[in-house]
Regions:
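PLP-dependent enzyme catalytic core of the Aspartate aminotransferase-like
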Residues: 2-18, 373-374, 386-427
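Conserved core segment of the aminotransferase class I/II
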Residues: 250-252, 257-322
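Conserved core of the PLP fold type I
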Residues: 81, 86-226, 230, 236-252, ...
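Short, conserved charged micro-motifs
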Residues: 362-367, 404-408
Length: 427
């Protein structure tokens, strides 16, 4: 062994290992923003919920049984054989020009007239949320969100040290008067609001649809108060009963950033989403994206582009919507049949989720182990609040299991809840 004042080199048959005199405590070096990082409750449940004996009503995994796999295989093979050199090379930081044109065609179904130059392709819409947060949020800035809100957005905002303020919802989504109150209260406290984040169509986690008149009123409020709107729309094309209203971006191209994704309408494993941004913000978005990922995957962009060019994709989306409608119907029927009468729940017209409200004495976090023992998984309501609110609520995801498994899972969950209510003499 050779040694120096602060360094020891241990020689052995294995590769050389270098030791400092004192073991490092690496967690002490973490940045402040990293100290509060933790896995989302959904991710923490994933390992358990993915066990085959568990009926998972937890994660929002799209059901890919309606995806034409043979066609996807053919598209991919043809792409590699005929255009592999481009597909497997680095690409534009803003995204492939052809796909950006096609994305504009997709958004046209939501009433949006967009130019490809204003589209920034991202690694899923989750990366778009990260980019928006990075270029807008300073520590302690306020972000307004729905109550409840998407857990992935809450985690991103927290990572950038934002203060999240929840705005009340009802069965028709965000309440405009509550938004006015939240803005007034926040501004009177001398705090800076950076943007409003919302999911107008079949909201995650509540499943509710924001009506057209509320969209207009919310846009008017935000324009008057000079607050940017971030409109996240993963589920807008997956309506069951009637088309959703036009996107908010369709009415305001200057004060709305629109986020879209192919995760729900094609497949999440391709990891392609996008942001439609006001022209004044595009350069910063592209620079921020290039600094973290260089460019979105050229390969998966071109797979999607070929799919859109060669597949009747509107019909395919309709097939997905029919699949999810059947599962929604099974979930609502099971809730009506098995859940206690004191429980209430939303009745979504599209998307993946149902929001259940139980008597306030019930703690859905405490019930998770009992539900797992009964072979069913769900997400407690507190996951969707930044402040731990919502202990008596939970989210049911009906997108992935079969209708029969959904019925089985909801029946089991109802049994767990009823047993808890009986043991605590809750009506």
């Amino acid at each position: 062994m050779e040694s120096g004042r602060n360094l020891r080199v241990v020689k052995s048959d294995s590769p050389v290992r270098i030791h400092t005199g004192k073991p490092e405590n690496l967690p002490e070096r973490l940045a402040n923003r990293a100290l509060g990082m933790k896995a989302s409750e959904i991710r923490s449940l994933f390992a358990v919920a993915s066990r085959p004996e568990i009926v998972s009503l937890a994660g929002g995994m799209p059901n890919l049984s309606a995806l034409p796999m043979e066609m996807m295989a053919s598209v991919t093979q043809k792409l590699i054989l005929e255009n592999g050199a481009e597909a497997l090379q680095y690409g534009s930081g803003q995204g492939h020009p052809k796909l950006r044109e096609q994305i504009c065609d997709v958004m046209a179904l939501e009433g949006i007239k967009a130019h490809p130059d204003d589209v920034v392709v991202t690694t899923g819409s989750q990366q778009a949320l990260d980019l928006i947060s990075r270029i807008f949020i300073d520590p302690n800035d306020v972000v307004l969100v729905e109550a409840p809100s998407y857990v992935g957005a809450l985690g991103t905002f927290k990572q950038y040290e934002a203060q999240v303020v929840h705005v009340a919802m009802d069965q028709d989504g965000l309440i405009p008067s509550a938004l006015k109150d939240a803005i007034a209260t926040t501004k009177s406290a001398g705090r800076k609001i950076k943007f409003l984040y919302l999911i107008p169509n079949y909201q995650n986690p509540a499943g509710v649809l924001l009506p057209a008149d509320r969209r207009t009123e919310i846009l008017d409020i935000c324009r008057e108060e000079q607050i940017l709107v971030v409109e996240d729309n993963p589920y807008g094309l997956l309506g069951f009963d009637k088309p959703s209203p036009n996107a908010m971006r369709a009415s305001d191209s200057e004060n709305v950033i629109y986020l879209g994704t192919f995760s729900k309408t094609i497949a999440p494993g391709l990891r392609i989403g996008w942001a439609l941004v006001p022209q004044s913000l595009k350069e910063k978005m592209v620079i921020a994206s290039e600094s973290s990922i260089l460019c979105p995957s050229n390969f998966t962009q071109l797979v999607i582009s070929s799919y859109l060019a060669n597949q009747p994709w509107r019909d395919q989306i309709a097939s997905f919507a029919k699949l999810y409608k059947d599962r929604r119907d099974a979930a609502l029927s099971a809730l009506d049949k098995y859940f206690p009468k004191s429980a209430t729940w939303t009745k979504p017209g599209g998307g993946f989720y149902i929001w259940v409200t139980l008597p306030p004495e019930i703690d859905t976090n405490a019930l998770v182990p009992k539900a797992i023992a009964a072979k069913v998984a769900y997400v407690p309501g507190t996951a969707f609040y930044a402040d731990g609110f919502g202990t008596w609520s939970l989210r049911i995801s009906y997108c992935h299991p079969t209708p029969e498994r959904i019925t089985e899972g909801i029946k089991s969950l109802a049994g767990v809840i009823k047993t808890e209510m009986e043991s605590r003499q809750i009506n």
